[in-house]
Amino acid sequence: MNAAPTVLLQQTQTLSAAVTQPIPGSRKIFVQGSRADLQVPMREIVLTRTPTLFGGQDNPPLSVYDTSGPYTDPQAAIDLAAGLAPLRADWIAERGDTLPLEALSSSFGRGREHDARLDAVRFPSRRLPRVARSGANVTQMHYARRGIITPEMEFVAIRENQRLEAVTDAVLRKQHPGEAFGAAIQQRITPEFVREEIARGRAILPNNINHPESEPMIIGRNFLTKINANIGNSAVSSGIAEEVEKLVWSIRWGGDTVMDLSTGKHIHETRDWIIRNSPVPIGTVPIYQALEKVDGRAEELTWEIFRDTLIEQAEQGVDYFTIHAGVLLRYVPLTARRVTGIVSRGGSILAKWCLAHHKENFLYTHFEDICEIMKAYDVAFSLGDGLRPGCIADANDAAQFGELETLGELTKLAWKHDVQTMIEGPGHVPMQLIKENMDKQLRECGEAPFYTLGPLTTDIAPGYDHITSAIGAAMIGWFGTAMLCYVTPKEHLGLPNRQDVRDGIMAYKIAAHAADLAKGHPGVQVRDNALSKARFEFRWDDQFHLGLDPEKAKEFHDETLPKDAHKLAHFCSMCGPHFCSMKITQDVRDYAAEHGISEDHALEAGMQEKSGEFVAQGAQVYRAS
């Protein structure tokens, strides 16, 4: 074991309180599965009693999906230098189809391991990776197609249901019918349904055997809509400690997966620290690191360098790879008349390689070789859209859709190897063209999960692209996209800071939830109903705690009404005490109850009383004060 020197250890010894304190008004709970070591974490929002004025009943706690891992659990001991507990290690080992390696398989990984100059940044706890036994396939899709329900599948089913069976209040269970556009939305998610969806290719459960710390989650249009957050250092910004904190910050606010897009120094070591401390799946774009290995000269990339990079990252524990195998030589000329050309970093790297060699993309020609690597570690494909439109003028053009058709072809090839696969999508698309993207993806790619960046619905709002894209994200999520890649306010302008990450995640949590409401996902309206009930009953703290960002809600409220007494007030600063619509509604109800009449009759009687007062006072519209 290599002991990291003091500087990095000091930086990572303690995360800031802002990223580790419990979510206000919530506590961590664990839902027991069928075996002792299967406990599914959730966040339980503790609610206060309804005031006597409104009936005086207790409000039971509400369970919600939680991505924050142990970082918001005051009972958990966090040691970044040791990493998280290997939750899935026993599940992986007991299947008997993997074995620990005696040494790293990647030549680059071995070189880093023996380079003493890296001791200052190396993750201190060394662990040898596992790999599939000779001839074995260790993907969740392979198990699913053999009829096996794994512990990971049961974990996912429990997690997706969010203890909906505990909600018995008819007011909270009320839900509008949804429009799911042909999706097979279930009233209750069972482990068998999870297995069926993975076997069919309509969902993926990204869980590399070398990332046993991860809490199983699922991506598919028949499940809750997920969001991804991007982190990563660059040549000009941020170090390892900052990236680990950014990871924890991202999952605190709801990042279901995190992509490490690092392009600066110490990519390998940064990724080690991130994966060992991540309870959510980690994705990467391996071509970025491969390019670093040839000093940024795309034309010098080779299959051998890329293959070694895939194995290096798979043995670290990366759960899904963005692979731009659909950028074909014949599609590159189709981008020549675009307004913004090729905007994907990965797409431009592969296009440059194709043109430099006048050969077909080596990721395409070696695709089945890549599948062999993926199924030996259970890494999922995220087939990259290297020709996505970079402005709305280029949306839905021949280059974009040509690549999508090729991704459909590659999906079927990946499924032949039982490799889990999702498809990446645009980009910049005006609202009227969004559904065409979703419909074509479902048709071409056999309903494999769609994973989209937005799309941004207009190009005129630099600094606000978390909003322009959340509009498109909500729409395409409703139409069937399974995971939404967040966009921050800094998109097109610079690298996001911590506040930008939070703003981007919040915009996308809203979009994902709005999509689930529109699809009619079972129980998804419970939280809305609970918050609305709390709002009507002036339970201010409950309103804050039921929101996606309790801290921001309380901060805004307290800007104008900061005292504790204001948390009991039957008004807010918007309307004040005399014009609160909800207070007036309650006054009508009280009048009706006092006089033993219906609310409609109460309104009529109240109008008659006011009419009499008006006439008695002289029937003057304006009176001297």
From Swiss-Prot:
InterPro entries: ThiC, ThiC-associated_dom, ThiC/Bza_core_dom, ThiC/BzaA/B. Its EC number is 4.1.99.17. GO terms for molecular function: 4 iron, 4 sulfur cluster binding; carbon-carbon lyase activity; zinc ion binding. Gene3D superfamilies: 6.10.250.620, Radical SAM ThiC family, central domain. It is an enzyme of class 4 (lyase). Its cofactor is [4Fe-4S] cluster. GO terms for cellular component: cytosol. Binds 1 [4Fe-4S] cluster per subunit. The cluster is coordinated with 3 cysteines and an exchangeable S-adenosyl-L-methionine. GO terms for biological process: thiamine biosynthetic process; thiamine diphosphate biosynthetic process. Substrate binds at N230, M259, Y288, H324, S344, R345, G346, D385, G386, L387, R388, E424, Y451. The keyword Zinc applies. Zn(2+) binds at H428, H492. Pathway: Cofactor biosynthesis; thiamine diphosphate biosynthesis. It catalyses: 5-amino-1-(5-phospho-beta-D-ribosyl)imidazole + S-adenosyl-L-methionine = 4-amino-2-methyl-5-(phosphooxymethyl)pyrimidine + CO + 5'-deoxyadenosine + formate + L-methionine + 3 H(+). The keyword Transmembrane helix does not apply. [4Fe-4S] cluster binds at C572, C575, C580. PANTHER family: PHOSPHOMETHYLPYRIMIDINE SYNTHASE, CHLOROPLASTIC, THIAMINE BIOSYNTHESIS PROTEIN THIC. Homodimer. This is Phosphomethylpyrimidine synthase. It comes from Xanthomonas campestris pv. campestris (strain ATCC 33913 / DSM 3586 / NCPPB 528 / LMG 568 / P 25). The lineage of its organism: Bacteria, Pseudomonadati, Pseudomonadota, Gammaproteobacteria, Lysobacterales. The gene is thiC.
